[in-house]
């Protein structure tokens, strides 16, 4: 039984109430009684609106389902389909042209293109690593990944391999040649560095040369010519620091004494309360809120054990350099600028219950997140004894990513929620900025109207291929069987979706004002492939794109040196490369020509993916992790990948491509494989052979067999219910 404290119409879990009063409110000048009265009023006023938006989702889905069922044997008439969507209010009139007016936004969002990390906020170690990933060693990123092949004697090994190290150095020199070229020759020929009359000089066998663009020299640290100093360069707004120490193990092997090349990497990071976490009750939510508070105050720390040693990880300080003329100082942020991703409009959480007449109901989690992440983020706007030593925003803004919104009415509701939160917190209107995830179909086809609804708050739009595909499947569930999951990336609607997001953002004035982002690279171990392929995102006009790790951020940062995103956006300005008909093209299988073994392969792949993720989520509360696929390739999985897999199988089940028996048989085949993949985890509880005793196995089965009934195909209702059952069982056994 949850211990609760009454606050007006609210009954608040004591763990949350005490956290807010004892930890979050001190230093904000907000009176606790007035704060809780404000929370009560916001919940009372906005809950009916939230409920109505969810009813509208269900109403539209029911109308679309009915329309498709009446035409299931006919080819899709795209004109009739478009007209129908207009008639029911799904597809809205496009607004007149406008320009966003958001103000008070940090440079990391407005002018600096670079990688964006997404990390589960419930894990303090991950959160600290991500916040500190603003700067990363290129040498380490190259040496420790497959970007440098382990061939020709270049194996990683258990100790430093000079052959591999030399390949790393050569790769880094080639990078410097492209990002900050010399006026002649190559960085590979460098034998020393110096600063003369405020200019960087690079010594080579043929003499001393400067940079092709001298202004790219931004500063230095240490005493010039000393054994241990560094040079700061800048290109496309991103910094590169060359560390020089001829006495270091690596510097000894380098003709110029360079021991490392450090890149400005994760310019921004999203601390996630949503798809990458498993937060189902007050204890889970408070853990996340406390970590978010520590990140904003700058006092979050974590004991870390590595190589037999234990140390305390803390947030990095800012970095100070001497300006090129030797007379001034340049200070650069030592940490990533932090966003926080709240949950969407769907879920409730029993951290707070409220009285609706005679009935007690859980409060919508999205309303709670706006209030409590907004409150704790106040500490990131100022420094002091009560607020901590570090600052997040230098312009007085709090950045909140809002996911899974369906259309402009839901965006407008979020903006109203943010405005009400600002009133409760005593913040100026417009302090809470919004990042709009373009990951639901009704938002995609009405994106311009969605942006207009937040024109004075929006700082980011982002395509999320994974969730967007899940909604694509669920919206058109009754239209017929969908193509296989792996074929989705080559569909008409996907290209139109990615292009339209950039075009509409640029037309709304995002250049120089807000981020245009693109999605995650999920294959955490395949960094060579990432370096080869992910450059396509900045080439497409995106100022940021998601990466799964600090190492990936450093490697992806190279792409923003190779590509001038600002120039790409100028070239794309004014273009409209897609039509609404392309966006509405449903990815239906043209004919069911799959061989039985192909169907079995698809079902097994998806069942293994579902089990591999769900077993950790439900049994251990792990919301994001590297999950080996059926071929043992590690993939960064979260609820978005789960949504696709479960919805595809639900679709095939609905249209008779597979049967319930096929699903159960595949789950039973894949469970022992997943068990084996987790065998080294001492806390892991196998699903096989007692499948029906495993709540994780049953959750996976529920997600597929009842997938057509889940609201918009979301996985949270089933996951939360089963996770709560696991926690209840554990509490009873204790």
UniProtKB/Swiss-Prot annotation:
InterPro entries: Malate_synth_C_sf, Malate_synth_sf, Malate_synthase_TIM, Malate_synthG, MS_C, MS_N, MS_N_TIM-barrel_dom, MSG_insertion
Sequence positions that bind acetyl-CoA: 118, 125-126, 276, 313, 548
Cofactor dependence: Mg(2+)
GO BP annotations listed: glyoxylate catabolic process; glyoxylate cycle; tricarboxylic acid cycle
Binding site for Mg(2+): 439, 467
Similarity annotation: Belongs to the malate synthase family. GlcB subfamily.
Function per UniProt: Involved in the glycolate utilization. Catalyzes the condensation and subsequent hydrolysis of acetyl-coenzyme A (acetyl-CoA) and glyoxylate to form malate and CoA.
Protein name, per record: Malate synthase G
Gene source species: Mycolicibacterium paratuberculosis (strain ATCC BAA-968 / K-10) (Mycobacterium paratuberculosis)
